[in-house]
């Protein structure tokens, strides 16, 4: 059996850490190297990591000064020795046979990366997040351009560690959206990718998590820096025109559509809405005929119309109506 290195960044997750590590230790695939990276957590997380390591010899603990999620992941990768590499966030947990299924797929297809679906859990409600790419065969970005539209989460992928190291794409320290900053680069460099159309990971959305409590000034700055980096890498590699439609969609979705919806519902006075609007206009041309936008649901097309014509009151009204209906049900 091939060794799999599982990197788990740990910071202020006392309530969730044991559940996370237990789900890894109890995998049906047992050839694991579990690396817990205590990122200077001010609570008992460091002690808990040591206690967990005493119970399972496959666990090793790295204590370091706080440097953020990206820095913790990068530090864990440096310690990894397995053929394969998996990231698990410490407030999440994984399906019992995730590693077994992902490794079997990687070995069968000789892949650089294996993608899989996941459960998004918010307020106890589970929703499967999937993507529209073919499964059961070897693919690449060159063959499947819409890979660029797949969820960027690093934890929804198993990496061949040799490929990961050669790609030389560490997570950017100090920035939000570290997965968005790196995944499109991995897709560009990977020659063999496979996709398991099955949810194997539980992603937990918490009210006080990094992203739900994000600062809008830093969030907008980091989002734009990350997207500019992606566009720059594709241009440097002579691939911008090849993937123009996907890259323009990536900018529209990440720097305009999604953050603008959030800001409207939060009652933003227009400062950050205009910031995202100006950025998007400066980076992409006319996307009205973008094939991916044309595939949107009527609801998303309506939301885009609302944003384009600044009819924010209508989006707030629709959101309020949905909440009222949901409460009655």
What is each PLM-predicted segment?
Residues 38-48, 65:
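A conserved acidic beta->alpha catalytic loop
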Residues 64-80:
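Glycine-rich, basic loop-to-helix element that forms the pyrophosphate-binding segment
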């Amino acid at each position: 059996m091939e060794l799999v290195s599982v990197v788990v960044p740990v910071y202020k997750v006392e309530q969730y850490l044991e559940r996370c590590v237990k789900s890894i230790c109890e995998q049906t695939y047992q050839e694991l190297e579990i690396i817990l990276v205590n990122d200077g957590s001010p609570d008992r997380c460091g002690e808990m990591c040591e206690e967990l390591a005493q119970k399972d010899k496959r666990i090793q603990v790295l204590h370091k000064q706080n440097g953020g999620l990206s820095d913790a992941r990068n530090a864990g990768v440096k310690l990894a020795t397995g053929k394969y590499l998996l990231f698990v966030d410490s407030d999440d947990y994984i399906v019992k046979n995730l590693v077994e299924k992902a490794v079997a797929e990687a070995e069968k297809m000789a892949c650089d990366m294996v993608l899989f679906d996941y459960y998004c859990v918010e307020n106890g409600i589970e929703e499967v997040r999937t993507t529209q790419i073919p499964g059961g065969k070897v693919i690449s970005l060159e063959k499947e351009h819409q890979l660029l539209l797949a969820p960027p989460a690093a934890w929804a992928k198993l990496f061949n560690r040799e490929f990961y190291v050669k790609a030389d794409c560490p997570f950017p320290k100090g920035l939000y959206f570290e997965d968005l900053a790196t995944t499109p680069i991995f897709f560009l460099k990977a020659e063999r990718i496979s996709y398991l159309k099955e949810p194997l990971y539980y992603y937990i959305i918490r009210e006080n998590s990094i992203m739900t409590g994000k600062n809008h000034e830093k969030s907008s700055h980091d989002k734009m820096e990350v997207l500019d980096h992606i566009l720059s890498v594709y241009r440097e590699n002579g691939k911008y025109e090849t993937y123009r439609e996907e890259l323009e969609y990536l900018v529209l979705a990440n720097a305009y559509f999604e953050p603008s919806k959030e800001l409207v519902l939060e009652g933003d006075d227009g400062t950050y809405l205009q910031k995202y609007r100006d950025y998007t206009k400066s980076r992409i041309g006319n996307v009205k005929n973008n094939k991916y936008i044309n595939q949107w649901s009527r609801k998303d097309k309506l939301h885009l119309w609302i944003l384009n014509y600044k009819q924010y009151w209508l989006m707030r009204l629709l959101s309020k109506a949905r909440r009222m209906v949901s409460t009655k049900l």
